[in-house]
């Protein structure tokens, strides 16, 4: 999609000046140019031949070498981005509440990337490719009331990530945010030096030049459940084990940044099916009030963090509620159908919307985070800002059971419109902008070049 002509913002809000664009990175070094020449020479073929000969002759002795591609030996790591030479990053003061503000129309600095240019996007969130006729949802910048968010600088961020692992843990909304982050960083990475590997509960994006990974791990309840297979699960059959977490949590060890969420999977019923202690069958379960079960899960989760996470190495974040927009009367459109045909945010507001969130769950997580003793948990409050974005969901321009909606399904939006997930580029980019701000606001230990997941 080519960039549209300068569009006139809706006459609802006074716009603030857009944030300045990221600074231009320094030029590549002469050694990079030399290596580029070598790649076009017979030296490449010679190195490859020796590599294959070693594999043939020594087999097990070069197993770890075989896990890397030839490119890992011919291509250097990314040149260090001289962050210290840039103007100081203007970060908001710790006292500024980033969750309170307004959406400002901005077709100058947004979108942060183009849908068609991010080949890693899944069909689920590729709304333009799926036929959405409007694109205004991409052009809204979040402006906190008393400060400003820094523009996401992919090179500055990846320097922070050099040699490190970041993992989003939770449900498909955390995957939505993970996809956004991949699209934000991938333009600065060399072709052939970035890829996604999907394996079981993992989706792993490898940024080879930085020896870094951005990962998503499927655990919709955080604890163990009968829905832990990311591809096969049923809404009406969800059963959880609130005190069992190890099968998931063993995969979270030695990760540098952990970003958790869990909410939407809890919202189908007031009571949750809970597997009985010491049971060997998922059919052996009780029904327990939702908030009670949620509390048990977070006791298990927080205990695991306190016992297994080294706060000197690992930073822990928790994303608050991402809203559903299923009841248009809540934003003054009683004749609407869910979020269908919504093209603008809620702009003229004087108080928060009431979207029927279970705020007991929000408050419970906030209390758990506040009471952590050894491992700080930073809450990233995305709820109110996202409440106003009734326009930005995938709606009828998504997939169901792996396929685009049929005309017959689109004719029944009450049943088939997805007002949970978000089009990309879009709202999750702002979530990542806040995450970026939080990470850069904190000092972090130097890279230890940990062992990354096998590719």
From Swiss-Prot:
The chain crosses the membrane at residues 43-59. Highly expressed in leaves. Expressed in roots, stems and inflorescences. It is found in: Golgi apparatus membrane. The active site is at residues 172, 418, 421. A motif (DXXH motif) lies at residues 418-421. Residues 16-28 have a biased composition (Pro residues). Residues 1-15 have a biased composition (Low complexity). GO terms for molecular function: O-acetyltransferase activity; xylan O-acetyltransferase activity. Its EC number is 2.3.1.-. Xylan acetyltransferase required for 2-O- and 3-O-monoacetylation of xylosyl residues in xylan. Catalyzes the 2-O-acetylation of xylan, followed by nonenzymatic acetyl migration to the O-3 position, resulting in products that are monoacetylated at both O-2 and O-3 positions. This is Xylan O-acetyltransferase 3. It comes from Oryza sativa subsp. japonica. The lineage of its organism: Eukaryota, Viridiplantae, Streptophyta, Embryophyta, Tracheophyta.
């Amino acid at each position: 999609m080519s960039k549209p002509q300068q569009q006139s913002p809706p006459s609802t809000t006074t716009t603030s000046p857009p944030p300045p664009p990221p600074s231009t990175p320094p030029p590549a070094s002469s050694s990079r140019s030399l290596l580029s020449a070598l790649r076009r020479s017979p030296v490449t073929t010679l190195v490859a031949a020796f590599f294959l000969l070693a594999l043939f002759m020594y087999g097990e002795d070069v197993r770890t070498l075989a896990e890397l591609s030839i490119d890992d030996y011919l291509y250097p790591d990314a040149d260090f981005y001289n962050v210290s030479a840039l103007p100081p990053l203007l970060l908001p003061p710790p006292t500024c509440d980033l969750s309170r503000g307004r959406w400002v129309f901005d077709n100058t600095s947004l979108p942060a990337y183009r849908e068609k240019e991010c080949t890693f996007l899944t069909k689920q969130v590729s709304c333009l490719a799926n036929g959405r006729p409007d694109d205004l949802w991409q052009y809204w910048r979040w402006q906190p009331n008393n400060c400003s968010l820094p523009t996401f600088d992919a090179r500055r961020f990846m320097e922070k990530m050099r040699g490190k692992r970041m993992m989003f843990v939770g449900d498909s909304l955390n995957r939505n945010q993970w996809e956004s982050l991949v699209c934000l960083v991938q333009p600065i990475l060399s072709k052939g030096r970035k890829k996604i590997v999907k394996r079981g509960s993992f989706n792993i994006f490898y940024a080879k030049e930085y020896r870094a990974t951005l990962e998503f791990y499927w655990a919709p309840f955080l604890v163990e459940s009968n829905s832990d297979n990311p591809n096969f699960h049923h809404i009406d059959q969800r059963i959880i084990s609130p005190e069992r977490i190890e099968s998931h949590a063993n995969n979270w060890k030695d990760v540098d940044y952990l970003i958790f969420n869990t909410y939407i999977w809890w919202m189908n019923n007031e009571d949750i099916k809970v597997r009985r202690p010491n049971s060997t069958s998922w059919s052996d379960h009780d029904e327990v009030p939702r908030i009670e079960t949620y509390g048990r899960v977070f006791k298990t989760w927080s205990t695991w963090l306190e016992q297994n996470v080294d706060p000197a190495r690992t930073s822990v974040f928790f994303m608050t509620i991402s809203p559903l927009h299923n009841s248009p009367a809540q934003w003054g459109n009683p004749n609407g159908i869910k979020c269908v045909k919504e093209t603008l945010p809620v702009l003229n507001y004087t108080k928060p919307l009431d979207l029927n969130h279970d705020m007991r769950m929000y408050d419970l997580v906030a209390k758990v985070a506040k009471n952590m003793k050894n491992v700080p948990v930073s809450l990233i409050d995305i709820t109110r800002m996202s409440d106003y974005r009734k326009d930005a969901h995938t709606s009828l321009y998504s997939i169901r059971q792996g396929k685009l909606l049929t005309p017959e399904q689109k004719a029944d939006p009450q049943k088939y419109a997805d007002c949970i997930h978000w089009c990309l580029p879009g709202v999750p980019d702002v979530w990542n902008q806040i995450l970026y701000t939080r990470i850069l606001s904190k000092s972090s230990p130097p890279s230890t070049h940990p062992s990354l997941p096998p590719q």
